[in-house]
Amino acid sequence: MWRMRMRLLTGYLVLLALGQLPEHGALGQKYYMNFAFNNNNPDGEGGTGVDGGGGGAGGGAAGPGGGTGDSPHSQEGDGSAATDNPNDDHATSADNSLATDGDAIGKKESGGGSDGKSDSKDSSGGNDATPANGHDDDNDDSDSKDAKDRQDKEEEAGQEGKRTDHSHHSSYEISIDDSFGGRYVRSIYESSESHGHSGSNAGSNQRDNGARESSQENQDAKEVASEAPAQRAGNVPDGPETGAKEDDYEEM
């Protein structure tokens, strides 16, 4: 008999607990929604839960006018607390923890906004400090992407290619894109010479010097030939004894 009574009592307690859980869950949801609305709208009636003075006991909700801080939802909570249920303390502590966490999140968000403003000011100041010609004071290669610098380098490379000192130039254009560091190397010209310039290497211009000397000797020979007396017509000197005459082709 007593077993039947214990079963009935246990079933009654279970049903009572199951009936109280949805009520407290809905009440906690109301507290959270009210707190979220007041936190996102600080200009609303009564201000935030911190300024209202009743944010802790009332689940972070602001009272009408910021007086006692008891909202209609907190009164419902007091009425429901009249029943002897140990879960009420847990619900109140959970509401208080939610309120504290929400306040901390709101302060962090406001602090993040101020940091964003300061960052934007710093970035705008950095842009103002950049000279108009595109050159900055850092040590990276960001200046090489300026149009003026590229034109100057192309003109210098063109002038080097037009030189007539028998030097063979080969230019290589290297483009490097480093997306992590933000540094760009647009053009690097490396010239490799096969013969070298005058005075750069010993014996580098022997061919040029030899060509100049041969041209000078040819000019001197022409001057000597013009100064020599012309021979009479018909008197052709004999060649060497072992060879034929120089005008044998005329006789033949």
Swiss-Prot record:
Biological processes, Gene Ontology terms: negative regulation of female receptivity, post-mating; sexual reproduction
Highest taxon, organism lineage: Eukaryota
Residues annotated as signal peptide: 1-19
Main location: secreted
Keyword Secreted recorded: yes
A GO molecular-function annotation: hormone activity
Protein name in UniProt: Accessory gland protein Acp32CD
Organism: Drosophila melanogaster
